């Protein structure tokens, strides 16, 4: 389950930290600060994020 502070990995942007989650259901977006890609807002249903421990 994704929440603020969760560390995730994205195929294109690499590792990042979730800084904000907004929206409901299919429109849920996460703002993620990626080490290599900067700050991005992604729709979770398309993002294909892998949660890292």
Model-derived features with residue positions:
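Mixed-charge, Lys/Arg-rich low-complexity intrinsically disordered regions
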Residues: 1-7
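Short coil-to-beta-strand transition motifs
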Residues: 7-15
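A short macromolecule-binding patch
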Residues: 29-48
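Core RecA-like ATPase module of SF1/SF2 helicases and allied nucleic-acid translocases
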Residues: 51-52
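Short acidic/glycine-enriched loop/turn segments that link adjacent beta-strands
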Residues: 25-26
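Charged, alpha-helix-enriched surfaces in structured cytosolic catalytic cores
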Residues: 3, 13, 37
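Short beta-strand-centered aromatic/proline hotspots
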Residues: 14-22
């Amino acid at each position: 389950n994704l929440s603020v502070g969760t560390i995730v990995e994205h195929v294109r942007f690499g590792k990042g930290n979730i800084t904000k989650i907004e929206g409901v259901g299919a429109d849920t977006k996460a703002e993620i600060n990626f080490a290599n890609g900067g700050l991005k807002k992604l729709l979770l249903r398309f993002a294909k994020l892998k949660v890292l421990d």
